[in-house]
Regions:
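Conserved catalytic cores of phosphodiester-cleaving nucleases, focusing on short active-site segments
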Residues: 17, 43-74
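Short, well-ordered coil/turn elements that cap or connect secondary structure elements
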Residues: 26, 79-81, 105-106
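Hydrophobic beta-strand segments of well-ordered beta-sheets in folded domains
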Residues: 50-53, 80-87, 109
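Short, charged, amphipathic alpha-helix that recurs within catalytic cores of restriction-modification
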Residues: 64-89, 93-99
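Domain-level recognition of nuclease-like catalytic cores that cleave nucleotide substrates
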Residues: 90-114
Length: 114
């Protein structure tokens, strides 16, 4: 989520994720997203009649339980037809994929290396 003290690296990842949304043909890309279920995702876009949300994460974010809790909140709060795209640095893609598998999030989250 976009916070008051966004790091330069997180800002770069958030903007890269918004650009990726555009290159995938999604429309009405916004960053930050509109609030949804008491959360403010980093990016939002339209894909036909559905909304796609995006979260930018850094490699070090996966060493904290806060990230798991935040993703659990997204998966539990967003309607099942909504998709969450997780933008991460390519360098940590295998590690993050393992974490998502262990946490049971692979069915609701699309991982994108940026």
């Amino acid at each position: 989520m976009v916070g008051k003290t966004e790091s330069t690296e997180h800002e770069r990842m958030r903007k890269a994720l918004a650009t990726w949304f555009t290159t995938q043909g999604l429309s009405n890309v916004k960053t930050p997203a509109d609030p949804v279920a008491d959360m403010v995702p980093d990016v939002q876009a339209d894909y036909f009649a559905k909304i796609v949300y995006g979260e930018a994460k850094l490699c070090e974010d996966f060493a904290t339980p806060d990230t798991k809790d935040e993703l659990l909140n997204y998966c539990g709060s967003l309607p099942s037809e909504y998709k969450l795209v997780l933008g991460i640095p390519k360098a940590c893609e295998p590690t993050v994929q393992r974490a998502l598998t262990e946490w049971g999030f692979t069915h609701r989250i699309q991982l994108v290396g940026l």
